[in-house]
UniProtKB/Swiss-Prot annotation:
The modification Omega-N-methylarginine is found at residues 676, 707, 713. The gene is Hnrnpu. It comes from Rattus norvegicus (Rat). The modification ADP-ribosylserine is found at residue 180. The modification N-acetylserine is found at residue 2. Oligomer (via ATPase domain and RNA-binding RGG-box region); oligomerization occurs upon ATP-binding in a chromatin-associated RNAs (caRNAs)- and transcription-dependent manner and is required for chromatin decompaction. ATP hydrolysis is required to cycle from an oligomeric to monomeric state to compact chromatin. Component of the coding region determinant (CRD)-mediated complex, composed of DHX9, HNRNPU, IGF2BP1, SYNCRIP and YBX1. Identified in the spliceosome C complex. Identified in a IGF2BP1-dependent mRNP granule complex containing untranslated mRNAs. Residues 114-128, 134-147 have a biased composition (Acidic residues). GO terms for molecular function: actin binding; ATP binding; chromatin binding; chromatin DNA binding; DNA binding; double-stranded DNA binding; double-stranded RNA binding; identical protein binding. The lineage of its organism: Eukaryota, Metazoa, Chordata, Craniata, Vertebrata. Residues 624-651 form a coiled coil. The record marks 94-95 as: Cleavage. Residues 585-600 are annotated as: Actin-binding. This is Heterogeneous nuclear ribonucleoprotein U.
Length: 798
């Protein structure tokens, strides 16, 4: 047994970081890395024992439950015999879970890939922000290394010689780093010396090594930075096979609006640009991953003559606590003018002119200092003067003229109208196009608000379809790299202004606005946006189905489930499918060429799985029209049969849902909404791990029932049963009194936890004024599995 004062296995991420900070060590990295680093430091303090020596408190996944339960009990000796008894019960339960995972520990590369997909999908569904949340600064190994190079951490690691010696002692059979196919628990990832892990990644290329049959060691969790955009698209695609078919969204109410009024145009704006009912104020959506996106919109009318103006006020910088804020500007506004044919990213194209909150003017991605910075409650007046030799665009801040920002040749502009345009990043704005009786600040006498320009001198922006039956949605179907985006680009160019393209590329464009892209690259988080883009895209599709526009869904959409569930949202649209299925030789050439240019971003097992799931659409199901771009239906069907056979031979058989270890756990512990369970001992309460069945009689621990409301802990005698109401402890004395343990309330009477109890640690005082653990659980997002500030998209919100 270890004499280490800290049991690394039982620490949460925040506690691991705290211990590392006390020792002035780097607190960056995955949980396995933090455990590795802390254990090495503890061993060094205790006498320099190797970090991976069995029995020293490191993550030894072998052995029995009793061996694991004994580790780390010395620090709790002062808590009394009753505390030790409870800790043994917890450790024994953890031992059952770990042993259960070890039964399925040996897996091939394909199994490892499948497990990794499940972990990634689970993290996405639980709101994992990949290091972008305050207090959850778990960056990848790449950024951690960068921090160490800059002197921000003194990561202790084994020297190469020591790592090699430890590797030899463990034996070749235990050096495998593939992922286990067993159930993921708190101890699902094991540790390896940092030096050994780096050597494995260098030798293996993709960070994986082949496992031998019977190997019980679990692998190191592969950093997310190893994956490209295609991988996360594939993960999102797989979610549709597990999701229920959604109900068609409620159609937006038709609002009768005076079309002669100059206002923000609900058709000429981004889908995530939330416009108020009076159409004079707006903001960008900020819930979940939308906080990464910039949102823009134009006014309904433009001008090409005279001297006109409008006012814009920054009403709020919307708090986005779930977004990583260090060294990144998360609030920004650009205001100016653009052509109706320009994109919504103001300042990123030709004839798109913007003035930034940072005191910068931008056109065609070229930036230059201009004027001064502005902030909340500042009012910017935008002027356009068409009466001079060149068209002049200028600004004023709170009534103070800032001078001419842009000059445009009239010959180049060719009498095309300019429209008021705004681009927001986590900000809210409001406009005065002339509807106010009195402007925010006085304007020159020779200047006119755009609303007051005669209707015949104004130009109306493009209008969308009047009815849903006139709207069109085109779903692209094909393997990654088959040529879908190429077809979409060509088709959109042939029909300018008609389609809104929904694809990962377009989402990334709205994340990669000029300076923001550079900031993300400088902070080492650029690759994380690749994961966020597919997640945003799913929400975009839900919003799009409620808008009267024409859309192209530029995704793989190879599975029948994805096709059906997405098209079900667009009930009432003209639903079309475009299948891009080239010959196998052509497809291999295209993917090879793409890999040479962009790098290989999709694992081979993922491509094989998509080939096996590829299903051609049918007109009778959810499409009104199907177009085959290359191979026609008969030839494509033959090729798909070949792909399915190839996939079947290369991949292991898939496990059916709701089977395996999870099912056995459910049978043993009654896993349901009232009892989370775990092994033979019922350990859950009402959606919590504090449990109302832990071997004792119902109603004595956790859940709605208070632990101290009866004069007994669990009855008389015994030390825990197997779900039967046998007593666990003596009938008396009473152990909780008026204070309860794991009760429904968070405040009020002194209690041990809160409504959502999910912790193993214990406070300084058991049963009296120990609310810190419950509060920490709220902070760490255990309440309903989400961050307390996470905003989930729903139809009533937007």
């Amino acid at each position: 047994m270890s004499s280490s004062p800290v049991n690394v296995k039982k620490l949460k991420v925040s506690e691991l970081k705290e211990e590392l900070k006390k020792r002035r060590l780097s607190d960056k990295g995955l949980k396995a890395d933090l455990m590795d680093r802390l254990q090495a430091a503890l061993d060094n303090e205790a006498g320099g024992r190797p970090a991976m020596e069995p029995g020293n408190g490191s993550l030894d996944l072998g052995g029995d439950a009793a061996g694991r339960s004994g580790a780390g009990l010395e620090q709790e000796a002062a808590a009394g015999a009753e505390d030790d008894e409870e800790e043994e019960g917890i450790a024994a339960l953890d031992g059952d879970q770990m042993e259960l995972g070890e039964e399925n520990g040996a897996a091939g590369a394909a199994d490892a890939g499948a497990m990794e997909e499940e972990e990634a999908a689970s993290e996405d569904e639980n709101g994992d922000d990949q290091g972008f949340q305050e207090g959850e600064d778990e960056l990848g190994d790449e950024e951690e290394g960068a921090g160490d190079e800059n002197g921000h951490g003194e990561q202790q690691s084994q020297p190469p010689a020591a790592a090699q010696q430890a590797s030899q002692q463990r034996g070749p059979g235990k050096e495998a780093a593939g992922k286990s196919s067993g159930p993921t628990s708190l101890f699902a990832v094991t540790v390896a010396p940092p030096g050994a892990r780096q050597g494995q990644q260098q030798a293996g290329g993709d960070g994986k090594t082949e496992q031998k049959a019977g190997d019980k060691k679990r692998g190191v969790k592969r950093p997310r930075e190893d994956h490209g955009r295609g991988y996360f698209e594939y993960i999102e695609e797989n979610k549709y096979s597990r999701a229920k078919s959604p109900q068609p969204p409620v159609e937006e109410e038709d609002e009768h609006f005076d079309d002669t009024v100059v206002c923000l145009d609900t058709y000429n704006c981004d889908l995530h640009f939330k416009i108020s009912r009076d159409r004079l104020s707006a903001s960008s959506l900020t819930m979940e991953s939308f906080a990464f996106l910039w949102a823009g919109g134009r006014a309904s009318y433009g001008v090409s003559k005279g001297k006109v103006c409008f006012e814009m006020k920054v009403t709020e910088k919307i708090p986005v606590r779930h977004l990583y804020t260090k060294d990144i500007d998360i609030h920004e506004v650009r205001i100016g003018w653009s052509l109706t044919t320009s994109g919504m990213l103001l300042g990123e194209e030709e004839f798109s002119y913007g003035y930034s909150l940072k005191g910068i003017k931008t056109c065609n991605c070229e930036t230059e200092d201009y004027g001064e910075k502005f902030d909340e409650n500042d009012v910017i007046t935008c002027f356009a003067n068409f009466e001079t030799d060149e068209v002049e665009l200028s600004y004023a801040k709170n009534g103070q003229d800032l001078g001419v920002a842009f000059k445009i040749s009239k010959e180049v502009l060719a009498d095309r109208p300019l429209f008021p345009h705004v681009l927001c990043h986590n900000c809210a704005v409001e406009f005065n196009f002339g509807q106010k009786e009195k402007p925010y600040f006085p304007i020159p006498e020779d200047c006119t608000f755009i609303q007051n320009v005669p209707l015949e001198d104004r130009v109306r922006g493009p209008k969308g379809p009047e009815e849903k039956k006139d709207c069109e949605v085109v779903m692209m179907i094909g393997l990654p790299g088959a040529g879908k985006t190429t077809w979409v680009t060509k088709h959109a160019a042939e029909n300018p202004g008609k389609y809104n393209i929904l694809g990962t590329n377009t989402i990334m464009d709205k994340m990669m606005v000029a300076g923001f892209k550079k900031q993300m690259a400088d902070t080492g988080k650029l690759n994380t946006l690749l994961q966020r883009a597919p997640q945003c895209l799913g929400k975009f599709i839900e919003i799009a189905a409620r808008k009267k526009r024409n859309f192209i869904l530029d995704q793989t959409n190879v599975s029948a489930a994805a096709q059906r569930r997405k098209m079900c949202l667009f009930a009432g649209f003209q639903r079309k499918a475009v299948v891009v299925c080239p010959k196998d030789e052509d497809y291999k050439q295209r993917t090879q060429k793409k890999a040479e240019v962009e790098g290989k971003d999709l694992p081979e097992h993922a491509v094989l799985k998509m080939k096996g799931n590829f299903t051609l659409p049918e007109v009778a199901e959810c499409f009104d029209e199907i177009t085959y771009v290359e191979l026609q239906k008969e030839e494509a069907q033959k090729l798909l049969e070949q792909y399915k056979e190839e996939s079947k031979k290369a991949l292991p058989p898939e496990k059916k849902q709701n089977t395996g270890s999870k099912k056995s756990n459910k049978n043993k512990s009654g896993k349901n909404q009232f009892n989370r369970g775990g092994g033979h001992r019922g350990r859950g309460g009402f959606n919590m791990r504090g449990g109302n069945f832990r071997g004792g009689a119902p109603g004595n621990r956790g859940g709605y029932n208070r632990r101290g409301n009866m004069p007994q802990r669990g009855g008389g005698g015994g030390s825990g049963g197997i779900g039967y109401p046998y007593p666990r402890g003596p009938v008396f004395p009473g152990r909780g009194g008026y204070s309860n343990r794991g009760n429904y309330n968070r405040g009020g009477m002194p209690n041990r936890g809160n409504y959502n109890q999910n912790f193993r640690g214990r406070g300084n005082n058991r049963g009296y004024k120990n609310q810190s653990q419950g509060y920490n659980q709220w902070q760490q997002g255990q309440f309903w599995g989400q961050k307390p500030w996470s905003q989930h998209y729903h139809q009533g919100y937007y």
